[in-house]
Swiss-Prot record:
Protein name: Bifunctional protein PyrR
CDD domains per the UniProt record, alphabetical: PRTases_typeI
Stretches of the chain forming a coiled coil according to its record: none
SUPFAM superfamilies: PRTase-like
EC number: 2.4.2.9
Organism field: Streptococcus thermophilus (strain ATCC BAA-491 / LMD-9)
EC category: transferase
Subunit structure: Homodimer and homohexamer; in equilibrium.
Catalytic activity: UMP + diphosphate = 5-phospho-alpha-D-ribose 1-diphosphate + uracil
Gene Ontology MF term list: RNA binding; uracil phosphoribosyltransferase activity
A matching Pfam family: Pribosyltran
UniProt entry tagged with the keyword Cell inner membrane: no
A Gene Ontology biological process term: DNA-templated transcription termination
Length: 173
């Protein structure tokens, strides 16, 4: 198994900053935005976007944590552990995840969101888009497009969980 770092901490920070600027540029009503981090690493990326929005626009954007396990179609799971303490009706929810692959996690996240309310709009921000979609889902904000083969994996490490920030590509062959 070969593992290669393809994004270091500086490049990751730059990608998150770029996503933040794109969110600012493309949204007229920034005060209606709610960030929805998909557990686990999507939550930490969403927190970083939230911090950058505060620094750049002096905005206090609410953040919710989504657990998609109870809404997945490929895994049967326990109960939903999402943390949604705000009203999402009429808001512009931006789902945030580390990697976009088949689209199944995002579909589950959308199901979770609409089970809690009716947002005006749902967008998607991902740190890495690796392709290979099984569902018609596309990200609105992408940090890095990293085409992979089906056998390769993308591993996102964040300081809060893993002690460092990086993105690695893993080739099992």
């Amino acid at each position: 198994m070969k593992k290669k770092e393809i994004v270091d901490d500086v490049t990751m920070k730059r990608a998150i900053t770029r996503i933040t600027y794109e969110i600012i540029e493309r949204n007229k009503n920034l005060d209606k935005i709610v960030l929805a981090g998909i557990k686990t690493r999507g939550v930490y990326i969403a927190q970083r976007i939230q911090e950058r929005l505060k620094q750049l626009e002096n905005l206090d954007v609410p953040l919710i944590e989504l657990d998609t396990k109870a809404y997945r179609d490929d895994v049967k799971s326990e109960q939903d552990t999402s943390l949604i303490l705000i009203e999402i009706d009429g808001t512009d929810v931006i789902l945030v995840d580390d990697v976009l692959y088949t689209g199944r996690t995002i579909r589950a996240a959308i199901d979770n969101i609409v089970s809690h309310g009716r947002p005006a709009r749902v967008g998607l921000a991902v740190l890495v888009d690796r392709g290979h979609r099984e569902l018609p889902i596309r990200a609105d904000y992408v940090g890095k497009n990293i085409p992979t083969s089906q056998s390769e994996e993308i591993e996102v490490l964040v300081t809060e969980v893993d002690g460092k920030d990086s993105v690695n590509i893993i080739d099992p062959n």
